[in-house]
């Protein structure tokens, strides 16, 4: 993954913060929607799958877990593929895989076959779209990055609002097999989003400043030096604990309502409520995170969001009727939206732009292990106790614990770096150096925060969107 994975573009390109970036944001919005909403939306088919194959709650919960585990666990593989082939080809192939998995799943005759098709193949396809789209988004936006991350993250609740009732309708009209087939066709839209991912290139420079071919060949595919950063280690640990319980309530809330005796359509409407609230929570939280006095303390806002989410799970465990579940979904949608809007923004703030692609792949890999444990364990607990209260309590404790690990770890273990003075003399001197120097030192090592500040202050033109035959299809 090296310094910058995306399309192997030269470092030091100033983010356009607009232009074609809005098209990239739209593509990322759709990809995020499919990637995160799909594992939850397929839960509306669980009752039918239980009746069809004679399995338990824990068995069907594995479908969502495998989807999420593939989305997270293949992070390093996705980074290497992007580094080798570019974002656009990887996303096009990923869209085909995602569609093919659901189409084949519609012909399956056992739950294990569904694990391999709807779980592994579709999950791999979504992963090959999700990570490249995030990397491209964070290269196109800098000053507006919190807002861009919030808007793209809103794709998850928007698609959840649409896919959950749509899945219920498809199941009623065509059965779960017909529903899987139609959803597989919809996933081909990932290929369209992949076509929007055009690489950035900096303004043309003289031959003396061009990076030698030998140096390009030596770039690392995966940079493990991020583990030397204490902030990254704390974030990875906290995120891994968080995902143990974060995805459990959305997976089981529909079944919870059905077991209370409510109709399938009414039960599925709970996910629509959750998603509708989530739609507004994510961009609003992104705007708040972009405020001058909030952005330097974004990690603590993220910790608050996780505590809020965990507390909501604990309160939701006391729900005994449909009204209680509606209230739970409203507050869960707010807290879940805050977590979704901030998780990658905080990671970027911790490791910096240059190491983001390495960091996100390794974080997703660590989270994959937790995802494989969370929902299946909750399903097994439900099979043993037949009480959803315990499932929600365990999920709430896990998410709250992760918030405490992140907040306390950063407060006590991470030393704050003194703010760099921005005097007029220093700014004038830096501008003079930028104008006079013809060559950038090859092995300059700087802090990630300094890199981002330099890119913001540098009076260089924004990078232009180009079509590079080596990185585009």
Curated annotation (Swiss-Prot):
Q: Which InterPro entries match?
A: MCT, MFS, MFS_dom, MFS_trans_sf, Proton-linked_MCT
GO CC: one term?
plasma membrane
Q: Where in the cell is it found?
A: Cell membrane; Basolateral cell membrane
- Annotated region (Basolateral sorting signal), positions in chain: 427-449, 449-473
Which intervals of the chain are annotated as region Disordered? 421-447
- An example Gene Ontology biological process: pyruvate transmembrane transport
Q: Which GO terms describe its molecular function?
A: lactate:proton symporter activity; pyruvate transmembrane transporter activity
Its placement in the membrane is given as:
Multi-pass membrane protein
Reactions catalysed according to its record: (S)-lactate(in) + H(+)(in) = (S)-lactate(out) + H(+)(out); pyruvate(out) + H(+)(out) = pyruvate(in) + H(+)(in)
Q: Does the keyword Secreted apply?
A: no
Q: Give the matching Pfam families.
A: MFS_1
Entry keywords, A to Z: Cell membrane, Membrane, Symport, Transmembrane, Transmembrane helix, Transport
Could you tell me which residue ranges are on the Cytoplasmic side of the membrane?
Answer: 1-17, 83-91, 137-149, 201-231, 290-297, 343-358, 410-473
Of which family is this protein a member?
Belongs to the major facilitator superfamily. Monocarboxylate porter (TC 2.A.1.13) family.
Q: What does this protein do?
A: Proton-dependent transporter of monocarboxylates such as L-lactate and pyruvate. Plays a predominant role in the L-lactate efflux from highly glycolytic cells.
> Which proteins does it associate with, and in what oligomeric form?
Interacts with BSG; interaction mediates SLC16A3 targeting to the plasma membrane.
Q: What is known of its domains?
A: Two basolateral sorting signals (BSS) in its C-terminal cytoplasmic tail are required to direct SLC16A3 to the basolateral membrane.
Query: This chain belongs to which protein, by name?
Result: Monocarboxylate transporter 4
**Gene from which this protein is expressed:** SLC16A3
């Amino acid at each position: 993954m090296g310094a910058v994975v995306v399309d192997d573009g030269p470092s030091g390109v100033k983010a356009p913060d607009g232009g074609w970036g809005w098209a990239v944001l739209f593509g990322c919005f759709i990809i995020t929607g499919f990637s995160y909403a799909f594992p939850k939306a397929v839960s509306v088919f669980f009752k039918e799958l239980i009746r069809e194959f004679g399995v338990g709650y824990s068995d069907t919960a594995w479908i969502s877990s495998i989807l999420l585990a593939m989305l997270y666990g293949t992070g390093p593989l996705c980074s290497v593929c992007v580094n080798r082939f570019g974002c656009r080809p990887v996303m096009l192939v990923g869209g085909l895989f995602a569609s093919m998995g659901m189409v084949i799943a519609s012909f399956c005759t056992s739950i294990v076959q569904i694990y391999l098709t709807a779980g592994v193949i579709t999950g791999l396809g979504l992963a090959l779209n999700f990570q490249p789209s995030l990397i491209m988004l964070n290269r196109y936006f800098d000053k507006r990055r919190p807002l861009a991350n919030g808007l793209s993250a809103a794709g998850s609740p928007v698609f959840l609002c649409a896919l959950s009732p749509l899945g219920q309708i498809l199941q009623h009209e065509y059965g779960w097999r017909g529903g899987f087939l139609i959803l597989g066709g919809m996933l081909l839209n990932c290929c369209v989003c992949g076509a929007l991912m055009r690489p950035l290139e900096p303004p043309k420079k003289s031959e003396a400043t061009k990076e030698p071919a030998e140096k390009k060949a030596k770039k690392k595919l995966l940079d493990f030096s991020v583990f030397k950063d204490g902030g990254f280690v704390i974030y990875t640990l906290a995120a891994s604990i968080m995902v143990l319980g974060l995805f459990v309530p959305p997976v089981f809330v529909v079944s919870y309502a059905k077991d209370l005796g409510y109709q399938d359509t009414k039960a599925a409407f709970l996910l629509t409520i959750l998603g509708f609230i989530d739609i507004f929570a994510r961009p609003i939280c992104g705007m708040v995170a972009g405020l001058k006095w909030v952005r330097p303390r974004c990690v603590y806002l993220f910790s608050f969001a996780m505590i809020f989410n965990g507390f909501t799970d604990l309160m939701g465990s006391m729900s005994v009727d449909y009204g209680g579940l509606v209230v739970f979904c409203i507050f869960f949608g707010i807290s879940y939206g805050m977590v979704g809007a901030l998780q990658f923004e905080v990671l970027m703030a911790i490791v910096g732009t240059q190491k983001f692609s390495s960091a996100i792949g390794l974080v997703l890999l660590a989270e994959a292990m937790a995802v494989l444990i969370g929902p299946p364990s909750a399903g097994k607990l439900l099979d043993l106790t037949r009480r959803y209260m315990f499932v929600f309590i365990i999920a709430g404790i896990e998410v709250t614990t992760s918030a405490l690990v992140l907040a306390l770890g950063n407060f006590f273990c991470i030393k704050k770096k003194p703010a760099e003075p921005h005097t007029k003399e220093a700014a004038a001197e830096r501008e003079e150096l930028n104008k006079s120097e013809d060559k950038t030192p090859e092995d300059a090592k700087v802090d990630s925060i300094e890199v981002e500040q330099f890119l913001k202050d540098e009076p260089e033109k924004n990078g232009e969107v180009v079509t590079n035959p080596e990185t585009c299809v």
